[in-house]
């Protein structure tokens, strides 16, 4: 069962990324990248993680609002593209691991600079 959940998560990620590129015309979601999908064990709820290039708070909030507004369209399109008994409810969440990784890189570079001095 876990293998199936992983396959469905990957397929949903691929489809949502494609839907955002081709079908959603909202300028607030331009530059949004889908980084992962987490499904519940019963496949009823999906949390879709995204990152955005410009991580300014107002841009992140606008992207979240745009994704929330487009969630009905995205859910319908996912249901048409993927054969599932029931299409999961979709919730979007910002993926903070990208920011965390950038902060780690910044700290490593600072340590290297201090060691060179």
From Swiss-Prot:
Q: Which GO terms describe its cellular component?
A: cytosol
Q: Which InterPro entries match?
A: KH_dom-like_a/b, RbfA, RbfA_dom_sf, Ribosome-bd_factorA_CS
**What is an example of a Pfam family matching this protein?**
RBFA
Compartments in which it is found: Cytoplasm
| Recorded GO MF terms | ribosomal small subunit binding
Cite the PROSITE patterns for this sequence: RBFA (PS01319)
The biological process GO terms on file are:
maturation of SSU-rRNA
Similarity section: Belongs to the RbfA family.
What NCBIfam families does the record point to? rbfA
The subunit field of the Swiss-Prot or TrEMBL record says: Monomer. Binds 30S ribosomal subunits, but not 50S ribosomal subunits or 70S ribosomes.
Please name the HAMAP family in this protein's record. Answer: RbfA (MF_00003)
What's the protein name? Answer: Ribosome-binding factor A
- Tell me the organism: Lacticaseibacillus paracasei (strain ATCC 334 / BCRC 17002 / CCUG 31169 / CIP 107868 / KCTC 3260 / NRRL B-441) (Lactobacillus paracasei)
Organism taxonomic ancestry: Bacteria, Bacillati, Bacillota, Bacilli, Lactobacillales
